[in-house]
Amino acid sequence: MICAVYKSLRKAESYLFVEKRNDFERVPEALMAMFGEPKLVMMLPIEKRDHLGFADIKKVRSELKEKGFYLQLPPPVVNLLEQHKKEIGFNPD
């Protein structure tokens, strides 16, 4: 299976994988409105891949088959200062 990967021009580091190039029929309208105009990044032979950057390849394949698309969002931003404060038991009270 070869899928098309699009990036969002509106949402940084957000990618939409679809089964066929320029086929957004199975993608919900609300998602497309939020995603904005999709810009083609690459055509990807997904069956020949063992892994993808931040995405779980098995989940991508599964959602492409079930839903017809997969949305990859950026990982959450980690506040390292707050994380460190919790680790050392800092409490400003």
UniProtKB/Swiss-Prot annotation:
Coiled coil: none
A Pfam short name: YcgL
Protein origin, superkingdom: Bacteria
Disulfide bonds: none
Listed InterPro entries: YcgL-like_sf, YcgL_dom
Residue ranges occupied by any YcgL domain in the UniProt entry: 1-85
PANTHER family in the cross-refs: PROTEIN YCGL (PTHR38109:SF1)
Protein name per the record: YcgL domain-containing protein Spea_2443
